[in-house]
Amino acid sequence: MDQDFNPFFDDPEEQELLNRLEIMLAEKAYYFFDVSDWEDMIQHYLQVQQFTKARKALVHARQQHPVSREISLCEADLFLDTHRYKDAIAIIKKMERETPNDPEVQRALGTAYSRSGRTYEAIQCFKNALNMQHEDSGEIYFQLSCEYAVLGKDAAATYWIQKILETDPENAGALYDLGMRYDAEGLFDEAVRFFETFTEKNPLNQDGWYHLGNAYLNLENFKDAIHAFEYAIVCHEEFSAAWYGKGEALLRLGQHHDALESFNTSLEIEGPSPHLHFEIGQCYEFMNEFNKALHHYNKSLEIESDFEDALIGKAWCLYEMGHFQNALESIDKTLVMYAKNADAWLVKAEICRKIGQASEVDDAYENALLCDGESWETYLDYSDYLFTEGNSEAALFILERGILQTGNDSDLAYRAGVYAYLSGKTESAFNFWLVALSEDPEKAPQVFDYAPNLYKDSRVLTFFGDFKNEL
C-alpha cells in the first residue's frame, strides 16, 4: 500500500475496506466486496485520478460481479475520465439494449454524450431519463440546464433551473445558478419578479432574499435592495454575502457610516478578502478619511497584489493626501498593467493637472477617451481643463466631439454654452443653450453652478427666463 495514500473515506469502516483493497491490489491477499463497496472505492480512485488503481479494481470487481450494472457504469466513468468517449458510449449503449427503460443508463449515456460534445443527443437522453424517473429529478433538471446553456439557449437553461426550485426550494446551488444566469443575461426585472414570488412562497429562505436584493441592486433600486438583504440577515444572522450586499447598497445611497458597519460585519464573519477591504476603503475615501482608506486599499493589495480597483484607489488617496509624486508613480505602475482602464487615466490626468505636467494631462484624457469614448463626464472634465488653461477653442471642440460621440445634448451643450458666452460668442452660446433646453430644461441650473457670475448677467437671465415662460 502507498505510504502517502490520502484517505477518501471519513468513516473508519469504509476506510478499512479501502485499506483491504489496497492490500488486494498489491496481490498480497484476496477479499470479497459487495457491489456497492466496489462502486464507492472505484469512484474514489476516479475522483483522486488514480486511474491505474481504478482499472485494477475494475478487473477484480468484474470477476466478483460479472453482470453488475453498477460496475459497468463505473467502467464507463473510467473511460470518460480518460477521454475514451467512444468506449464509454459503447458500454452504455450495450446496457441500454439490455435495459431500455433504466433512467440511470439514460443519464449515464447523456453524460457521455455531453462530455464528448454531442449536446443535442445528451439532451434527448436526459429527457428520456426524466420520463422514466418521476422522483428525485433535480439532478436531471440541472443537467438539462447545463446542456441548454452550452447551446446558448438561455431561456431554456433558466426554465430547467426554475424546475429544480419548484421541487426543492432549499437548493442553494440552484438559486445561485439562477441568480448568476439572470445577472449574466441582464434580466434584472425578470429576476425581481421571480425572486419576489419565490420569497412570498418561501419567506424563510435566506438565499431567495439575497438574490432578490442582488436583483434590486442591479436595477439601482437601493432601498428595496437593503430591505431584501435585511430579510436575508434575519433568516441567517451570519450571512456574510447579505451583509456585503447591504453595505454596497448603502454605499451607493451615500450612507457611508452605515455601509462601513455592514462591510465590517461581513469582514468579521468571512475574514479578510480583497473586495471587502476595497469596499471599506471606499467608505473611508468618501468620508475623506484618506489615511484609513489607503490602509484598507493596501490591505486589499496584500491579498491580491494586482487588484485593479484597489490600485487606482491607492493612487487617488496618495493624491488627496498631497503625496503627488508618490501618487504619480503609483498610477503609472497601475497603467503598466491596466492600460485600458479609463478611470486610471483620469486619475493620472488629475495628478498631472495638479503638478503642472500639461502635455501629460492631454495624453491622459485622450487615453481615457480611447478606453471609454461614451463617457460624457470625461469630455466635461477634459474641456474644463482646457478652458481653465485659456484654450476656449479647444474646450469647445472637445465638447462638440463629445456631443457627436455620446449623444448627450444637455450636459455637454449647457457647458459649451458657458464657454462660448464667456469667450464673447453670445450667439453661439444661446444656440448651445437652446439645444440643451430642448433636451432637458431641468438641468439649466448647472450653467450657474459652473459660472455663478452669470447670475449677475441680465442677458443670460432674460434668455433663460424667456425660455421658461414659453414652456
Task: Give the location of each predicted region.
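Start-of-helix register in tetratricopeptide repeats
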Residues: 36, 70, 104, 138-139, ...
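Structural marker of alpha-solenoid helical repeat scaffolds
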Residues: 64-65, 97-99, 132-133, 167, ...
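Canonical positions in the second alpha-helix
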Residues: 61, 94-95, 128-130, 163-164, ...
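Canonical tetratricopeptide repeat
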Residues: 74, 108, 143, 177, ...
